[in-house]
Curated annotation (Swiss-Prot):
Belongs to the ING family. Component of HBO1 complexes, which specifically mediate acetylation of histone H3 at 'Lys-14' (H3K14ac), and have reduced activity toward histone H4. Through chromatin acetylation it may function in DNA replication. May inhibit tumor progression by modulating the transcriptional output of signaling pathways which regulate cell proliferation. Can suppress brain tumor angiogenesis through transcriptional repression of RELA/NFKB3 target genes when complexed with RELA. May also specifically suppress loss of contact inhibition elicited by activated oncogenes such as MYC. The PHD-type zinc finger mediates the binding to H3K4me3. The N-terminal coiled-coil domain mediates homodimerization. A zinc finger (PHD-type) spans 195-244. The record marks Y197, M208, D212 as: Histone H3K4me3 binding. Residues 115-160 are annotated as: Disordered. Citrullination by PADI4 within the nuclear localization signal disrupts the interaction with p53 and increases susceptibility to degradation. PROSITE patterns: ZF_PHD_1 (PS01359), ZF_PHD_2 (PS50016). The gene is ING4. Keywords: Acetylation, Apoptosis, Cell cycle, Chromatin regulator, Citrullination, Coiled coil, Metal-binding, Nucleus, Tumor suppressor, Zinc, Zinc-finger. This is Inhibitor of growth protein 4. One of its GO terms (molecular function) is zinc ion binding. Zn(2+) 1 binds at C198, C200, H222, C225. It comes from Bos taurus (Bovine).
Amino acid sequence: MAAGMYLEHYLDSIENLPFELQRNFQLMRDLDQRTEDLKAEIDKLASEYMSSARSRSSEEKLALLRQIQEAYGKCKEFGDDKVQLAMQTYEMVDKHIRRLDTDLARFEADLKEKQIESSDYDSSSSKGKKSRTQKEKKAARARSKGKNSDEEAPKAAQKKLKLVRTSPEYGMPSVTFGSVHPSDVLDMPVDPNEPTYCLCHQVSYGEMIGCDNPDCSIERFHFACVGLTTKPRGKWFCPRCSQERKKK
């Protein structure tokens, strides 16, 4: 594939990337603003509770505490949604980077293959010209000697035959391109510095959920690895932390 085709295909693949990034960043800004609004509401409710705690009934104080708790719950949901958006944005960009690395590797492999073909053709062409020149000189000498002696003709013929048999035109080795197949470079290495998560000890990708146990050693899990298809409502604990909680 020509270099222009590689570039054209890659540019087509990233055509919508700026709009997708802009959308995700705008959603994250909206989540930040909603979180700040809720934090202001929590401060207001907390001040109201502290200033009038003695004069309020138990039911009124409990209602205020529930409002504060619900506001904190929504803040946590907004935070989780923002983390999911950030991970989705990272995966989106990383996918295009891997695509670019793969196309570059294929392009370099194509260049190597063409260089080998060109070198092989130039070598065969120069050696072929040299062989033809030698045969022409031998034939000329044979013709000049043939006028004076009939015995020179068979020798000249033998020399010409020998030249044809040993000519590089008929003895060039075949070139194998197996070492530069583009398919050998499709699997790109994973960044060794990228952190791993989940029970599978893999890098972050797709939809993930965080364990609500602050002491969880793993912290985040892939939906598929913990049997989830949608984000559960309320608190969620990973399988390990759930077992520990049951023991207590």
